[in-house]
């Protein structure tokens, strides 16, 4: 399992990055979600790694 936490604002991000954050289900700063560790989720995290914090649980 991966815990993904939004730590930076989406202000100034391009639309694809905003869509990725939305697809991850993150809306507010400091909001956390848990995901299965799959290549799809890893790819999404890689696209917005400057905005999120990831921990394995």
From Swiss-Prot:
Gene Ontology terms for molecular function: structural constituent of ribosome
Quaternary structure and interacting proteins, as annotated: Part of the 50S ribosomal subunit.
PANTHER family according to UniProt: LARGE RIBOSOMAL SUBUNIT PROTEIN UL30M, MITOCHONDRIAL RIBOSOMAL PROTEIN L30
Entry's transmembrane regions: none
Protein's name in the database: Large ribosomal subunit protein uL30
UniProt record, GO biological process: translation
Pfam family, one: Ribosomal_L30
Source organism: Maridesulfovibrio salexigens (strain ATCC 14822 / DSM 2638 / NCIMB 8403 / VKM B-1763) (Desulfovibrio salexigens)
């Amino acid at each position: 399992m991966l815990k993904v936490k939004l730590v930076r604002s989406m202000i100034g991000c391009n639309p694809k990055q905003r869509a990725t954050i939305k697809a991850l289900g993150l809306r507010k700063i400091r909001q956390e979600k848990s995901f299965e560790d799959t290549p799809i989720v890893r790819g999404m995290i890689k696209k917005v790694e400057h905005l999120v914090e990831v921990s394995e649980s």
